[in-house]
Amino acid sequence: MLKIKLILTMIVCIYASMAHALVLEDLVKDGKLEATLSQKKIGYYIGSFDPPHLGHEDVVNQILEQNLCDYVLIYPAWGGDEYKNRTDVQVRLEMLFAAFANHPKVIVTKLTSAELQGVLMKRDESLVAGKPSVKTTFIGTEYIGVIGSDTALETSKDLKKLSVFMRGIQIPEKYKEHTIGGIIAIPVQSFIVSLRAGDSIDSLKGVFSDRPIVKTISTDYIDLSSTKVRKIIKNGSALDKSFVSQGVKEIIEKYNLYQE
């Protein structure tokens, strides 16, 4: 029995060492995108990820372990919006690729929001908030929005934002490389909400933007945020393994991020 357990452990370790995130551009290039996404549930996880921390990774792990989604597509805010002080998107993308390097059910990409929409969506005849819309290109693909409770609570107060949030609107020229482009690029049918410390979404009554909240997730890192990580670094404190993964830590050190 012990020998069998050792063999199984070795197999798991070998598989883990070979596992890696899926790069959307590679799926397109290799002609595997449709086979990968058809009849699948895809979590669409957008955020600043400045930097991506262990709380983000835990949210993704829980979604996949609980079979809430088949894959999770991670997409950073590109910038151009009211938050002017984000780290350059290319550096944040580098950190995301490092953070999720060994997650075989995670999809990462460096495509702009317009390129992302062009790959995953096709034009629809209907209008959303009076604007041309899009729908999924592949049969049976269902997208589920993954958002933080802060986003859910803040956005729920703004009817204008609610009317377009993750509804799949054809991206106009001015938003092709913009945070708003990522927000409107893909229509989601439901939401998974990650709870932040001190937040309650009871007031939403299980619905956000006229679509159901299918799951709320509490992580072991509920008090951890990108803001907290940045403050730790700025204050000169050590960034240990309880905050970010080793790959992300190395990139932060390489670029001397968050020193000011």
Describe every region a protein language model picked out:
Residues A21-E260:
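Nucleotidyltransferase catalytic core that binds NTPs
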Residues M1-A21:
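Classical Sec-dependent N-terminal signal peptides that target proteins to the secretory pathway
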